[in-house]
Amino acid sequence: MQRPENDIKGIAPRKLLIKRSGEKKMICKIRKWKLSDATDLAAALSNKKIQDNLRDGLPYPYTEQDGTEYISAMLSADENETFAFAITVDNKVIGSIGVFRQENIHRQTAELGYYIAEEYWGKGIMTEAVKQICEYVFAGSDIIRIYAEPFAYNTASCRVLEKAGFQYEGTLRSNAVKNGKVIDMKMYSLLK
């Protein structure tokens, strides 16, 4: 079976059993962004609950034009420094995931960031996407450590990382200011 040209080579899409009123198999995969994804991206990010778990700087509401600008930036980024992909379920874009190489003495370390649309929370999809991107980055680059720093109150994100094999390294006390509050963050990492 031939892969569509935007699929990530070497990463097999996996079927997840999603439990709703009935059981439905959904295919979760990461793929390169397309400019036509801007509408789905804007729909996912125009949600305050999602933005409350991300770093500051995103416009709210998030527009299709904002999505187009972000996707353009990701498509033009150095592919050895920025690994940024759309998360899809059954060919619909439902979120974003990226691994971003650090600099200087941390040049073989990269930070992981991600989110998915609220209606897909708690279904194992994000854990699967995290596994896929880590597999891809470790197989195709010299990166030896991928880390993530979720807000300490974001227990769902912490669970995603743990289920994806990341190890909890500690709490970064009073490490950020979000929505006017000083908050802790947690440090997780996965080694090659």
Please state what every model-predicted region is.
Residues 1-39, 43-49, 84-192:
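Acyl-donor (CoA/ACP) binding surface of acyl/acetyltransferases
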Residues 45, 54, 75-78:
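Hydrophobic residues in alpha-helical segments
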Residues 51-73:
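Conserved GNAT-fold acetyl-CoA-binding loop/helix
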Residues 72-86:
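A short helix-loop-beta-strand connector motif used in the catalytic cores of GNAT acetyltransferases and
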